[in-house]
Regions:
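Extended, helix-rich architectural segments
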Residues: 1-185
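Charged, low-complexity, helix/coiled-coil-prone segments
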Residues: 2-8, 37-55, 63-75, 93-96, ...
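Structured, contiguous alpha/beta core segments that scaffold functional sites
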Residues: 8, 139-300
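Long, contiguous amphipathic alpha-helices that act as assembly "spine/axial" helices in icosahedral shell
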Residues: 31, 58, 99-141, 251-286, ...
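Short, mixed-charge, low-aromatic patches
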Residues: 57-68, 77-84, 93-95, 216-224, ...
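Short, hydrophobic/amphipathic alpha-helical patches that form generic packing surfaces
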Residues: 63-71, 260-279, 432, 451-458, ...
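Flexible coil/linker segments and helix-coil junctions enriched in charged and small residues
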Residues: 87-91, 185-192, 434-438
Length: 524
């Protein structure tokens, strides 16, 4: 069966999710999701929402997720030894050398990510996940490419495993004319609008074949000669992502869809407030028919001008809807706060006594809401993304080949980073309570400082290798400092002894005689 036929067949299952995504996009970021088969071929007038709360929430949530999944300063993964595969006589020196090698590999991968535009593509994919609930990421040799929901269809089994993916995109004929005969490319060169087009519809068909994925591209039901590819499941470059999953559904649902009611209500109230405020701001004067003041005289009068007439004959039209506007304004404020909390937009209490601790607790409560999102994205995105990155680096020779049975990559971002943050808070509170209850001496007597430093570093995701001195090094330096201090004390005691009256020749005759005898003694 041709890829175009499969795409049209599977598009019927996608229509409901695509329509919900389009409605969610209209209230937040209208440019993200277009119609059923609309492409970015020309300018289209998009409807602008009357409120920007939804757009701000989507951008904020996507940015927080991106920084949590791919942090800038720290690594999102670590290479660790599988303890079950190592012997008990494994020397600690060898383990330290391996840790240094692993750290070098991690730096190489992070440098390659920083040099590419992966974070830009990941942020775009997360925006689609927040709004539409679905996105397809393709990891090519040139970087990441994001497919919106209206450009691909997917088929999954009962367990949610991907069976088939078909994408549709428009590509210039000049790029693929060497792979197909000219007469094939000339088919359907006139669009539905009776306009000549230099682009053709290219369908990419990805199917699962046992423990691997195979794919090819078709144009007008003809396979492109250089488009075939295959990859094992664990390093598959096609990564379909879902935000919220429902058992039995092949597509996900976005964060916006969960709070679409509040967004629609806020949109209606914002429109009413904006239009009502514009009507109330309009100034219209009325003149009594029996007044001596003519409307033309009033209209022509400048600022500060003097005209003839009575003030009672001139009035101003007032809307008189202040109470109604106040009710709508208060309800809109309530909806805005609820939407901001849903999209993890931190609202600090405006007061003169807002403390840093209150801000920190508010931020921590917002981060704890990301637990479920981190868990899903860690499994669906970070694991295949890391496997593909490591495989490409090994093929290019940038890093040595990693034995899978001994070394295993572990994700330390996302939900794991959130758990480390909670461990840090618990440890800090424990030490603070211990110092306040038993005093600082108790910490020095009962707490293992070396272990505290290691746990705090682990909670921050910091590698302590060659950074923090070991207890043996600290003890050696303390012993050397103590010996140096004792030597200085002995030297000072000798100097002080020379200054005592017993050793002073002017005050002790015996010492003076001994010095004279030493001077009179001839040299040998």
């Amino acid at each position: 069966m041709h890829a175009r036929t499969r795409y049209d067949y599977l598009a019927s299952d996608r229509s409901q999710f695509l329509e919900e995504a389009r409605q969610a996009s209209e209230l937040t970021l209208p440019y993200l999701i277009r119609g059923h088969e609309e492409h970015m071929s020309g300018m289209k007038q998009l409807k602008t929402p009357f409120q920007s709360v939804g757009a701000k929430g989507c951008v904020t949530l996507a940015s927080k997720l991106m920084l949590a999944l791919l942090p800038v300063q720290t690594s999102f993964f670590k290479l660790q030894l599988d303890e079950s595969q190592l012997g008990e006589e494994f020397p600690p020196e060898m383990r330290s050398e391996l840790d240094l090698s692993f750290a070098k590999v991690e730096r190489i991968i992070l440098e390659s990510i920083s040099a590419s535009d992966d974070r830009v593509a990941v942020h775009q994919a997360l925006l689609h996940l927040v709004v539409a609930g679905n996105a397809l990421v393709y990891m090519s040799k040139h970087g990441l490419k994001v497919y919106p929901l209206n450009r691909y269809v997917v088929d999954r089994d009962g367990n949610g495993q991907v069976i088939e993916i078909v994408t549709k995109e428009k590509i210039s004929k000049d790029l693929i004319e060497s792979q197909l005969p000219r007469e094939v490319l000339e088919i359907n060169q006139v669009t539905d609008d009776n306009e000549y087009s230099d682009n053709v519809d290219v369908y990419t068909h990805i199917k699962r074949d046992n423990n691997r994925y195979v794919w090819h591209q078709e144009v007008n039901d003809k396979v492109l000669t250089e488009s075939r590819g295959k990859a094992p499941i664990d390093i598959n470059p096609w990564i379909p992502l879902r935000f919220n999953t429902v058992d039995g559904e092949g597509y996900g649902r976005g964060r916006v869809g969960q709070f679409i009611g509040d967004l629609k209500s806020l949109e209606g109230l914002s429109q009413a407030l904006v239009e009502g405020s514009a009507a109330a701001a309009k100034v219209v004067f009325t003149v009594s028919p029996s007044s001596t003041t003519k409307p033309s005289t009033l209209a022509a009068a400048g600022n500060g001008a003097i005209i003839q007439g009575r003030p009672d004959d001139i009035g101003v039209i007032q809307v008189g809807k202040t109470a109604d506007f106040r009710t709508a304004y208060e309800m809109a404020g309530t909806l805005e706060r609820r939407i901001s909390d849903a999209f993890l937009v931190m609202n600090i209490r405006q007061s003169e006594r807002t403390t840093a601790e209150e801000v920190r607790m508010t931020q921590m409560e917002l981060e704890q809401q990301l637990g479920g999102l981190f868990s899903l994205l860690t499994v669906d995105f970070l694991v295949p993304y890391l496997n593909r990155k490591l495989n490409e680096a090994q093929k290019k020779g940038e890093i040595p080949k990693i034995p899978k049975n001994i070394v295993k990559p572990t994700i330390v971002a996302g939900i794991n980073a959130l758990g480390r943050g909670q461990d840090r808070e618990s440890l800090s509170q424990f030490l603070t309570i211990l110092a306040q209850t038993l005093g600082p001496e108790a910490i020095a007597n009962f707490i293992n400082t070396d272990e505290v430093i290691k746990r705090l570093a682990a909670s921050q995701g910091i590698d302590v290798l060659n950074l923090v001195r070991s207890m043996q090094e600290v003890q050696q330096e303390a012993q050397a400092a103590q010996q140096q201090q004792m030597a200085m004390q002995q030297q000072q005691m000798a100097v002080d002894a020379m200054k005592t009256p017993v050793m002073d020749p002017s005050k002790n005759g015996e010492v003076a005689m001994m010095e004279q005898q030493a001077q009179q003694q001839p040299p040998q």
